[in-house]
Amino acid sequence: MVSWRRFCWHYHGWTLGCYMLLAIIALKLSLRLKCDFDVMDLDSKEFQSQYCRDLLYKTLELPAKSSINCSGVIRGEQKAVTQALLNNLELKRKRQSFTEADYLSMTADCEHFKTQRKFIQVPLSKEEANFPIAYSMVIHEKIENFERLLRAVYTPQNIYCVHVDQKSSETFQQAVRAIVSCFPNVFIANKLVSVVYASWSRVQADLNCMEDLLQSPVPWEYLLNTCGTDFPIKTNAEMVKALKLLNGQNSMESEVPPPHKTFRWKYHYEVADTLYRTSKEKTPPPNNITMFTGNAYMVASRDFIEHVLSNSKARQLIEWVKDTYSPDEHLWATLQRASWMPGSDPLHPKFDLSDMRSIARLTKWQDHEGDIENGAPYTSCSGIHQRAICVYGSGDLHWILQNHHLLANKFDPKVDDNVLQCLEEYLRHKAIYGTEL
């Protein structure tokens, strides 16, 4: 400081400028000291400063893997979307995903792993800290997909149960265990099952996590269930606000079944290597319950989950649907219309809720794609289709972010990593600044 004073005194014409410079330096240092990232509330006075937010964003900013214009892609600018799609075609074959061995190596030092991979390690607001969310995450392959999904939804106040398919490779299971071991609020389900597509085992995986999550000391109020091809399209803060607005109600697809879907519970199904239908007809549903259809995904209150596991009528329905086709697509939808389930909706068709009106999951179905001006609910998929569902491409991101859902399905970095990269960048920026890119 003495040398600065002598310098300023010697060049007295610069005195005012020198002291202004010193004041700016002192202010920046004081701001740095006030940016307490260990006890953080983005709504607090100190984090209203651009400096603190910039510093936090720089710490948590995800490394860009390509030079695409994510802001343009998010706004739906055709030039940016075209460049992103072309860039994806160029890099798709060259891109190397992280392997199980990579994660086993990275997680040898958990603190370094969490810092290097930019996990958010403190609640970003008091509102979020006081409203933890429970996750049931059912996965079976693609370790990088799982880690990126976990990173996108992770906050230290939430609680995460991971169900790993029992028939997944041993190296995959080891890598999942290694990742999970780095977080005190992430755990593997106590009971694992071998999941067969469209069979009861898919529901059982979620039920196993539900049981474990209810045993957790974390006072969560809502549960979201995910699979390995899901990704959030809202920040944790936005999710908390949406869940509070539900005020104890659930949100999941539940509609009167079309005639072609009723066969799913009219016949007995059995599992060999796959699920197959027998000629044996089933008895009617128990308690004269009315059947509804929906999908596997839910936004469900804690009370609803507790009743799923303990209510006698719910347990009878669970037993009855075990030998049906794709029971996850009618069990939750039917329970959501049962008057004895908390947060449910009445039976009347006016209370039907489509997947587009529910907030649980945003999906583009191939047979509904088309020209919006001619009545289609959404435009064509810019990625590819898998089992008649769009695996999103960069051209879908603008549309995705216009919707109110909490998560979307399906994403796959091997199909289009740019759409995921831009979505990750969007979510991280919005989590810190509260604004879009």
Curated annotation (Swiss-Prot):
Pathway: Protein modification; protein glycosylation. One of its GO terms (molecular function) is beta-1,3-galactosyl-O-glycosyl-glycoprotein beta-1,6-N-acetylglucosaminyltransferase activity. It comes from the Eukaryota. Disulfide bonds join C70-C227, C161-C381, C182-C209, C390-C422. Residues 1-6 are cytoplasmic. The chain crosses the membrane at residues 7-27. Residues 28-437 are lumenal. One of its GO terms (cellular component) is Golgi membrane. GO terms for biological process: intestinal absorption; kidney morphogenesis; protein glycosylation; tissue morphogenesis. InterPro entries: Glyco_trans_14. It catalyses: a 3-O-[beta-D-galactosyl-(1->3)-N-acetyl-alpha-D-galactosaminyl]-L-seryl-[protein] + UDP-N-acetyl-alpha-D-glucosamine = 3-O-{beta-D-galactosyl-(1->3)-[N-acetyl-beta-D-glucosaminyl-(1->6)]-N-acetyl-alpha-D-galactosaminyl}-L-seryl-[protein] + UDP + H(+); a 3-O-[beta-D-galactosyl-(1->3)-N-acetyl-alpha-D-galactosaminyl]-L-threonyl-[protein] + UDP-N-acetyl-alpha-D-glucosamine = a 3-O-{beta-D-galactosyl-(1->3)-[N-acetyl-beta-D-glucosaminyl-(1->6)]-N-acetyl-alpha-D-galactosaminyl}-L-threonyl-[protein] + UDP + H(+); a beta-D-Gal-(1->4)-beta-D-GlcNAc-(1->3)-beta-D-Gal-(1->4)-beta-D-GlcNAc derivative + UDP-N-acetyl-alpha-D-glucosamine = a beta-D-Gal-(1->4)-beta-D-GlcNAc-(1->3)-[beta-D-GlcNAc-(1->6)]-beta-D-Gal-(1->4)-N-acetyl-beta-D-glucosaminyl derivative + UDP + H(+); 3-O-[N-acetyl-beta-D-glucosaminyl-(1->3)-N-acetyl-alpha-D-galactosaminyl]-L-seryl-[protein] + UDP-N-acetyl-alpha-D-glucosamine = 3-O-[N-acetyl-beta-D-glucosaminyl-(1->3)-[N-acetyl-beta-D-glucosaminyl-(1->6)]-N-acetyl-alpha-D-galactosaminyl]-L-seryl-[protein] + UDP + H(+). Glycosyltransferase that can synthesize all known mucin beta 6 N-acetylglucosaminides. Mediates core 2 and core 4 O-glycan branching, 2 important steps in mucin-type biosynthesis. Also has I-branching enzyme activity by converting linear into branched poly-N-acetyllactosaminoglycans, leading to introduce the blood group I antigen during embryonic development. Belongs to the glycosyltransferase 14 family. This is Beta-1,3-galactosyl-O-glycosyl-glycoprotein beta-1,6-N-acetylglucosaminyltransferase 3. The lineage of its organism: Eukaryota, Metazoa, Chordata, Craniata, Vertebrata. The gene is Gcnt3.
